[in-house]
Amino acid sequence: MKNLKKLIAVVSTFALVFSAMAVGFAATTPFTDVKDDAPYASAVARLYALNITNGVGDPKFGVDQPVTRAQMITFVNRMLGYEDLAEMAKSEKSAFKDVPQNHWAVGQINLAYKLGLAQGVGNGKFDPNSELRYAQALAFVLRALGFKDLDWPYGYLAKAQDLGLVHGLNLAYNGVIKRGDLALILDRALEVPMVKYVDGKEVLGEPLISKVATKAEYTVIATNAQDRSVEEGKVAVLDKDGKLTTINAGLVDFSEYLGKKVIVYSERFGDPVYVAEGDNDVVSFTEGQDSVGTTVYKNDDNKTAIKVDDNAYVLYNGYLTKVSKVTVKEGAEVTIINNNYLIVNGSYDNSTIVYNDVQSGDKYLNRDSNYELKGTVTVTGAVSKVTDIKANDYIYYGKQYDVNGNVVGTVIYVVRNQVTGTVTEKSVSGSTYKASIDNVSYTVADNNVWNQLEPGKKVTVILNKDNVIVGISSTTTTTAVNYAIFKEKSDPFTAWFAKVKLILPDAAEKVFDAVYSDVYDKVNLAEGTIVTYTVDANGKLNDIQRANDQPFSSASYKADAKVLTEGSTTYYITDNTVLLNNTSDGYKALKLTDLKDATNLNVKIVADNYNVAKVVVFNNASFVSTTTSTVYAYVTGTADVYVNGSTFTRLTVLENGQTKTYDANAQLATNYTHKAVVLTLTNAKIANIALPTVASGVKLTNIDQANLRITDTTNKGYLLDPNFIVVDTNGNLKGLSDITKDTGVNLYTNDVGKVFVIEIVQ
């Protein structure tokens, strides 16, 4: 008895409280009568993990069985961590005459009696096998939490309700409680702070779960969702000494605690079952200007600077990196936690109107390398898939970086917000441009957009996320119906005889009856003029207008990029572009796949405001199967191939980050293995091999991988191709981390002057 009293005194102490936040526990139990979607499933799972319950056997939890008084006392003792004490109390004489010494719960009942958790039912009896009532169960739980002097039964009922123990339960206070309902109450009680009384006042302590779970203090850094180097099922944390490590995540979602100090409570198998948030200094604001180094700026009148720890982690656009590796862009939403962890969302490098629907396999948005779809692409806003981004959407583009500053992903926020109406007013004040659409005033992004808005004209404008007009929507028409080439009109052309011959997008000639009164003054057109037209309900031509075409005499076409260029102007060709070739045998319809690389093209182009071609008419263009292209690559292997009595060389190369093979027309005399090369391809075969421009023996003083820039010792800067590689002279793939200030390198550049191969030479 003396030892028991001593132990009771020890386990009755309390600790300081931390503000707690509930964490759901997934429903994983061995019990066949507990379904994963049952309302009590997660509660039973945590009680089982903490060894508070082992079920009723067979293997079942007994969700619909009534709770007995002996079972309830056992639950309470185990929740308080008193299982060992109860085992010791078996040797004590039974406290109640109806609980024999060999009763399975005699130790539990003796201990509860000694601790004041149970007083029996009177006349020296405990009534261990009687069915427990709802209010009685609440009384046992509240006593375990340390509450005293509550009125029976409504004082207990009210306190349980205030603590959130009975949410969703609708039981009569004198009704029998079942094990499934009790599991909910016990599980909720685990997260309630225990109380003790000081000078008659309640003082909160640690949550009840602290009695049965081990605890440790951590700062949460990342899960696999924020850093793919973290193993699935683990979470990266800083321990109390500031050391980075990983622990099991268990069945707890740690994402809601990123950057915060927490107390992690773990069960008998070591997996977390509850997280209590510690004291954290949290400040949130909108970034007022681009960050400089490790200094960020509030969006207030003074652009208040906040210097964060040089080694601070930052969850930047959803991925973990270091603050020194990124620039927090103006307008981003910033949360700083304890001055050593930042959460930055909406940090965008660029924004733009989308000109073409995004297709599967597209490497860039708008075929612009500033909008490369690199790594894992996360799309939010109006759509959630990159292939759901459409022409006339407005997008914000940002990147994700790892802790070394490498780009690992792309983030895109999509705004699909257009307003159609009449321009009713325009104004300008200093550098602020305004326009009203149907008398609703909008700010206009710039002078170029503002100049396109004509009062009295109906338009569809594109808005950004701040409801600013950023462009005019290109109108989508059915090209097969609306565009044609004027061939001729009838002679005579009168009210009694009015016909017009047009060449349609499929190159077929069609003669239309015309509504003379509608078109008589519009058909004085030269043969070959590109026009738009409409017909009435009877199929008669009732309008014809010359399209605004642009003639070019020396255009070039690039098949891989699907672009037609003349000088500095680029036009984008799509599957919807009407393509015709005017040959000596008449007009021929072309498909996009018919177009090959070509130069010195004589063309007429009709395009929208974004240079997306609606109609392209070539004049005697020759698109044959012969295509010539240039490839900048690094040769990883060379093989001589013998086929049907002939021999040719096959090169295996790294091109734009991908392994490819190219065949020469004959056997090559030179071995190009482990060399950077320029391949001229004709019909996808090697016609010529040259060596690219190289800067030899360079040493680097700065490597800015985030912005794809490097600087040598002469302070000369080089831009890196997005798909650059680093190798040594033996062809082994390396990384930028292998280059120090004393490392000599050769820099091989492509046709636009960007470094595509860095070769380490020492």
From Swiss-Prot:
GO CC terms, sorted: extracellular region; S-layer
Signal peptide: 1-26
Post-translational events: Glycosylated; contains 8% carbohydrates, which correspond to about 40 to 50 sugar molecules per monomer. O-linked glycans consist of Glc, GalNAc and GlcNAc.
Secreted listed as a keyword: yes
Residues covered by the SLH domain: 27-90, 92-155, 156-204
InterPro entries to which the protein is assigned, alphabetical: SLH_dom
UniProt entry tagged with the keyword Signal: yes
Location(s) in or outside the cell: Secreted, Cell wall, S-layer
One Pfam family cited in the UniProt record for this chain: SLH
Coiled coil spans: none
Residues with glycosylation annotation: 297, 516, 520, 632
Regions that span the bilayer: none
Keyword list, A-Z: Cell wall, Glycoprotein, Repeat, S-layer, Secreted, Signal
Its biological purpose: The S-layer is a paracrystalline mono-layered assembly of proteins which coat the surface of bacteria.
Protein name: Cell surface protein
Organism: Thermoanaerobacter kivui (Acetogenium kivui)
Lineage: Bacteria, Bacillati, Bacillota, Clostridia, Thermoanaerobacterales
